[in-house]
């Protein structure tokens, strides 16, 4: 899978947004790795490099980069690989995913790159997430790649709001543990007796105010009962373990289930280029009003999440 310069620089912008990287750090990477300046033979703007060659070129420039910029650049390469592989419907091998995971883990656990601000937050679905690459367009997710980790801590979110959908198409690559995905057919109804749920509208708050514009770094999210009634029927259940991948179409309602005492980790890619539905929402109790999920991870750091996933993968390899 070749990665173009355009694809790499697009990912670099997304990683900068996800990590709140300083503009001078991103400028340094762009200058060093632009076509013709990357330490190898002159390239044209249309040139592409393999996943491996991108890593080699970054390593050739390590003396001109800080550890922070090295990690940012490598994560951008990994994000580019995942995006291009997914969009071209190409399978990513176990070795490919392991390489991407190693790059991510090294970045999250680096002790000297203090200026790279990876952050963890608690999802309404119970898992902890770390944004790795985020591109928002007109207030909606354009591309978003995150690390999702369900810790063996019993925290699985508010079960009243587990049935949800995503605005963008989504793809997940399983890193460790097992999860079960339940798909639902959801139809609007008028009769309250037929309804199983009510529809809820979602708003995000970044500490400056709440609205329907998506925010990469959130303080909380709130769902509000719309008064619209729906009937949800489970139509498919599928278990996913390490080495597998699955997709969730835009606006398809589903529930992700992970045992409360188990660890489960995925790389999750929200991709509006493969589908986007603006009014995708959440379902909840018919007689409910609203619910707010605080994003506070209660002190859990991205480094701790990465280490927990690393240890889980080691145990799986020994089993």
Regions inferred by a protein language model and the residue ranges of each:
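Intrinsically disordered, low-structural-confidence terminal and linker regions
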Residues: 1-31
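Extended, charged low-complexity segments
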Residues: 5-10, 282-319
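A short, N-terminal "cap"/entry segment at the start of jelly-roll beta-barrel domains
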Residues: 38, 43, 47, 51-146
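Conserved short histidine dyad/triad with adjacent acidic residue
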Residues: 113, 146-164
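A short hydrophobic beta-strand segment most commonly corresponding to one strand
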Residues: 171, 261-278
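Short acidic-glycine-tyrosine-enriched beta hairpin
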Residues: 185-250
């Amino acid at each position: 899978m070749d990665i173009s310069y355009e694809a790499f620089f697009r990912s670099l912008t997304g990683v900068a947004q996800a990590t709140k990287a300083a503009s001078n750090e991103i400028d340094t990477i762009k200058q060093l790795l632009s076509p013709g300046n990357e330490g190898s033979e002159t390239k044209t703007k249309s040139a592409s490099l393999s996943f491996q060659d991108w890593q080699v070129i970054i390593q050739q420039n390590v003396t001109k980069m800080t550890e922070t910029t090295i990690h940012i650049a490598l994560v951008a390469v990994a994000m580019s690989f995942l995006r291009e592989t997914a969009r071209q419907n190409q399978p990513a091998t176990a070795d490919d995913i392991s390489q991407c995971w190693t790059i991510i883990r090294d970045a999250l656990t680096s002790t000297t790159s203090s200026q790279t601000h990876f952050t963890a937050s608690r999802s309404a679905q119970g898992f902890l997430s770390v944004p790795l690459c985020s591109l928002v367009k007109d207030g909606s997710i354009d591309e978003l790649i995150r690390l999702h980790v369900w810790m063996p801590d019993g925290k699985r979110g508010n079960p009243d709001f587990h049935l949800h959908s995503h605005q963008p198409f989504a793809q997940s690559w399983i890193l460790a543990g097992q999860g079960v995905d339940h798909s639902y057919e959801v139809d609007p109804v008028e009769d309250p007796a037929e309804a199983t749920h009510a529809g809820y509208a979602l708003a995000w708050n970044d500490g400056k105010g709440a609205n329907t514009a998506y925010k990469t770094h959130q303080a909380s999210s709130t769902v509000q009962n719309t008064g619209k009634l729906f009937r949800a029927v489970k139509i498919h259940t599928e278990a996913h373990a390490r080495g597998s991948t699955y997709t969730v179409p835009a606006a398809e309602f589903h529930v992700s289930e992970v045992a409360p005492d188990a660890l489960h980790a995925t790389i999750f890619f929200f991709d509006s280029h493969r589908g986007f539905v603006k009014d995708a929402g959440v379902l909840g109790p018919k007689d409910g009003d609203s619910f707010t999920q605080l994003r506070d991870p209660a002190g859990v750091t991205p480094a701790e999440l990465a280490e927990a996933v690393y240890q889980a993968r080691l145990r799986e390899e020994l089993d």
